[in-house]
Regions:
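Helix-biased detector of long, well-ordered alpha-helical tracts
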Residues: 1-348
Length: 348
């Protein structure tokens, strides 16, 4: 039995304590760390039974995805590395048309990391996993020496069940497809940039980090005529569009006036000379589907949390395969530059 089931008593025990090398050595302190924090938030029969979870496989095809998270700072407006580690893998599965079912998680923790902060991370993971409808069924914890890790790094692996009748992939975009984004873009990247306090800029910007299976399911319930679903993480919407254009060997034409950007994000980008299209999102999707289905998809998205600002922002074309062209707000067309180099490191 877990002696730390009394939540208030458990939290009192964490005050002022830090993770030590002994917590990663496999002995009594390791068991205490697991009981005090991880079992308190992730406890379920699959997780606590043995070293590996024994699961019943889905009837149909499965999707598997893994992702590592090293975001800096680990805590930011709208989330933390724990919430992000659930959303990132859940969303990767969702973009394959797969209902997320199970997750595993690995923590690499720096010696001296505050227990209360680790508790906050685990609490966010528990809450987000419940919202996404997934169970954490296996995990591992390692402790690295001071300075060998920056705080805490997390890796999650997810398993999902592919929905019958849905096939989506980056190489399936077709000329004539409408291009949809599920909300205003660039929030997460802008939030992380401001949280680092390198520029002395203050703005009321919150990360869009969110689990998006519910949004994807709503779209699939509305229509199975879908070609591409991608989450616009590192490199933002612009990078994702270039990847799809290359994979499908199609051209992409965007309408700048239709791309939703929050005023506060646009303001920060204006001051720093950044393009919102290249800033990461952690709660936004890019969807490509026949234009006849576009409004149906947007209507379905607007009925869901996290996608009230969904919009049709462009179309897939036969011209200039592999390129992304922008129709500017003054009516001219410009080739969108393909991003390269280090855009914004450690945003996820």
């Amino acid at each position: 039995m877990n002696e730390y089931v009394d939540n208030e008593a458990r939290k009192v025990k964490l005050v002022g304590k830090t993770v030590t090398m002994a917590h990663g050595a496999g002995g009594r302190q390791t068991s205490e760390l697991i009981d005090m924090i991880f079992k308190a938030h992730f406890d379920n029969p699959d997780l606590t039974a043995d070293d590996a979870a024994v699961l019943t496989p889905p009837i149909g095809k499965m999707a598997v995805s893994t992702d590592g998270f090293i975001v800096s700072p680990a805590f930011y407006p709208g989330g933390n590395i724990g919430k992000l580690s659930i959303c990132g893998t859940v969303n990767d599965l969702s973009c394959m048309g797969a209902k997320p079912l199970y997750l595993t998680s690995t923590f690499v923790i720096e010696e001296g990391f505050p227990m209360e902060k680790l508790e906050e991370i685990a609490e966010a993971m528990e809450k987000t996993a419940k919202e996404a409808g997934v169970r954490i069924v296996s995990g591992d914890t390692k402790v690295a020496g001071k300075g060998q890790v920056d705080g805490v790094f997390i890796t999650t692996t997810g398993i999902g069940e592919i929905t019958d009748g849905v096939e989506v992939a980056g190489n399936l975009a077709k000329p004539g497809d409408a291009i949809i984004v599920t909300g205003d873009i660039g929030r997460h990247g802008c939030t992380i940039l401001l949280a680092r306090e390198d520029f002395g800029i203050e703005a009321d910007v919150t990360s869009d980090c969110a689990p998006l299976w519910g949004n994807v399911k709503a779209v699939m319930d509305a229509t199975h005529e879908l070609h591409v679903i991608r989450d616009a993480t590192r490199g933002g919407v612009g990078t994702v569009l270039y990847e799809i254009a290359g994979q499908s060997q199609v051209g992409i034409r965007l309408d700048a006036s239709k791309i939703p950007v929050a005023p506060e994000v646009r303001g920060v980008c204006g001051m720093l000379g950044l393009e919102p299209l290249y800033l990461a999102c952690e709660g936004r999707l890019v969807i490509m589907a026949p234009k006849e289905q576009a409004q149906t998809i947007v209507d379905a998205l607007k009925a869901c949390p996290y996608s009230k600002n969904a919009a049709i922002i462009g179309e897939v074309t036969e011209e200039q395969p592999g390129k992304v062209v922008m129709l500017t707000e003054i009516g001219t067309q410009a080739l969108l530059p393909q991003p390269g180099g280090e855009l914004l490191p450690r945003i996820c």
